[in-house]
A protein has these predicted regions:
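A short, charge-rich alpha-helical start-of-domain segment used by transcription regulators
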Residues: 1-19, 35
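C-terminal edge and immediately downstream basic/flexible tail or linker adjoining helix-turn-helix-like DNA-binding
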Residues: 4-8, 77-81, 134-137, 151-165
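Σ70-family region 2.3-2.4 aromatic/basic alpha-helix that recognizes the −10 promoter
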Residues: 14, 22, 39-43, 53-76
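A short pre-motif secondary-structure segment
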Residues: 118-122
């Protein structure tokens, strides 16, 4: 794959990159940082891509790793005082953002990351089971189990919220 082809792929996957980063990081600034780091790393490591057919999967895997790197760094840097202030600010922002989200999207975001990420990749980003397994470095059976677990949890949560109304 050439650098020009990678550039086109990145532009085509822009929305997917953002929504995948958002499922892990939540903060728009952190998402932008992760995407930027992903693009830099992808261009610098393009020679490690063995099969052009898996370029999108490879790019998403790099993004997920970058998101986890940001999470690790931020957990080391945040002091307790800053965490209290940050938590308050995030709660206010999340409340405003959640008002814009549909009930289903809120239910998806409430899932544990282990099952949320496969749901986003499968139902929103249109990755197939095999690609998700490669991205998350798990078996296809594990992806299917996580999707089934997520569907069950979503079904239960949405029924509970309907009953509350």
């Amino acid at each position: 794959m050439t650098k020009e082809q990678l550039g086109v792929l990145i532009l085509d996957c822009e929305r997917q990159l953002y929504s995948t980063a958002k499922t892990i990081l939540y903060s728009d600034q952190d998402c932008a940082d992760a995407i930027q780091d992903t693009i830099v790393k992808a261009f610098s490591k393009i020679q490690t891509l063995k099969n052009d057919n898996y370029a999108r999967t490879w790019l998403i895997r790099i993004l997920i790793n970058e998101c986890y790197t940001i999470l690790r760094k931020s957990s080391k840097l945040t002091s307790l005082d800053m965490m209290d202030e940050q938590t308050k600010a995030e709660k206010i922002m999340m409340t405003k953002e959640k008002a814009d989200y549909s009930e289903l999207y809120q239910a998806i975001n409430a899932l544990k990351e282990e099952v949320r990420l496969p749901v986003i990749l499968y139902y929103i980003e249109d990755f197939n089971i095999r690609e998700i397994a490669q991205i998350l470095d798990i078996t296809e059976g594990a992806v299917q189990k996580r999707l089934a677990r997520a569907r069950g949890k979503l079904r239960c949560n949405l029924r509970e919220s309907e009953a509350a109304i």
